Amino acid sequence: RERERVKLFYQIHCLVEDLSLENIAKLEQTIAPFSAFSSIEFLDITDKELEPRHNYRKLDVLIASEIKKLYLKLNAFSQKRFSKMIMCRFFFASLFHQYDKMIMFDVDTLFVNDMSESFFIPLETHYFGAVREKDLIAINRNSAKDLYELRQMHAKTIGVADAFPNLEEAQILFDNYFNAGFLALNLKSWRKENLENQLIAFFLLKNEKLLFSDQDALCFVCRGRILELPYSYNAHPSFLDTPSFPSIKESRMLHFWGDKPWKLFSVIGAKKWHEALIQTPFKDAYFNAPFLDHLFESFQNRDKEIKEIYALKKALSFSDKRHSFEFLLPRLSSKLLIEFLLFKAKQKVKRLIRRVF
């Protein structure tokens, strides 16, 4: 891809924690076909000792320590749901001092169209560009009062007090309610205005009361300095092709911020995610007998009357083509299918033995 007759080059940086050599190799193999215009590097945030390797380096020990310290201040719910990787968002200007501008995106995402244009959107005095959070609109609730009430309910559910305990602060958050899953970052402004320290100070003030920790801090501290990007750059699949949202054909990145396609196969967009995965070196470890069993169970649970073999057939040729897994058929070996059927037979025998004895 070119812009103004200049070829674009995608330098990919993966923030990881103690990633295995096998998975490093698989990620390198994944982008190998695109090596003419891309490369990949790894930045490990672990506090373990690491041997220096090609394109793999360890995070500065002081920053790693600060990230861990901040993470431990999160409430128990957030620590269970998120890894300490989320705290890296506060430190991008320090982590990538070689850049004045960069694109950041979460790992539970899938690019379905080119996103390079977002890099060239003028940010001017904005700290970053992001897509506005749309979950309230999706449930026909779209006011600061609605946001306040929903956050109070969520805070009560997880046993904490919300960091924004009044409507005035809820209004500020609502006016700057953006999703941090895709950010076009103006790191030059971050450094110039010492945004990193501002974010940390705010986080330390609110700490365990932040329901969405890093995202809450970014939205509140950077209020008025966030450029709204088109929804296509950070789209939740279930919202697409519905009123007030673009079509799935217009989307550039799908963000599975709720149910994950590798856990729940009925998630809208799961087919696209698996179609991408099956083209990578990770496919052999993923598409195995346990996968087929999980796939089978996900559909079997919908209809208890479906027989085993028909459940598998339904899963692989589901009538709704958004969920269909028929693309897997040419890649499923007879050996794998036999292993799966034997696995199901053994399950039945075990159940029968338990009933008899």
Regions found by a protein language model. Give the residues of each.
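Conserved donor-nucleotide/metal-binding helix-loop-beta segment in metal-dependent transferases, i.e.
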Residues: 109-144
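A glycosyltransferase accessory/donor-loop signature
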Residues: 159-164, 169, 173, 179-357
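Histidine-anchored nucleotide/phosphate-binding helix
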Residues: 1-6
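Short, aromatic/basic amphipathic alpha-helical patches
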Residues: 22-37, 144-147
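Active-site-proximal specificity loops/subdomain of glycosyltransferases
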Residues: 33-92
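Short internal beta-strands
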Residues: 10-18, 130-132
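Catalytic metal- and UDP-sugar-binding loop of GT-A-like glycosyltransferases, i.e.
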Residues: 105
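Short aromatic/hydrophobic "clamp" motif used to bind/position activated sugar donors
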Residues: 102
